[in-house]
Amino acid sequence: MRVYDLEEQPVRVDATTVSGYRNGGEDSLWQFGHSKDDPTLRQIKAMMATLDPLGLPLGLEVVSGEQADDRLYVPMIDRVLACLERTGLLFVGDCKMSALATRAHLVAHEQYYLTPLALVGETAQQMPQWIEAGLPSVPPRS
């Protein structure tokens, strides 16, 4: 057996759903949930973390289909951190990973994140000022 030290590449974390014509029930993973595909079908949800550039799976959690994505990030991040035992990793995710609690969890564990902010609430109103404040002064063209 050989063991290789993988370089610290970005860790991608995202959820997806699988829907189908399945019987559900209280104890079933197959539940109705928010669906981009067909809300009349039951679904299961899978949260996965992979290591770039290989797409190497680091963790997979399958849950019932009615669960929200944002509550699945921290447990998956913790699973990855237990596996890699490193600080300074870059976690990449969608806007659901931008929840303040998830970002705070990453910072508390000395990790980095790259995720778009969800344009809801005060974020949508304040973002133009943040961008303006971050841009260098550019003299007008003559």
Regions found by a protein language model. Name each.
Residues 1-142:
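Anion-binding and metal-coordination hotspots
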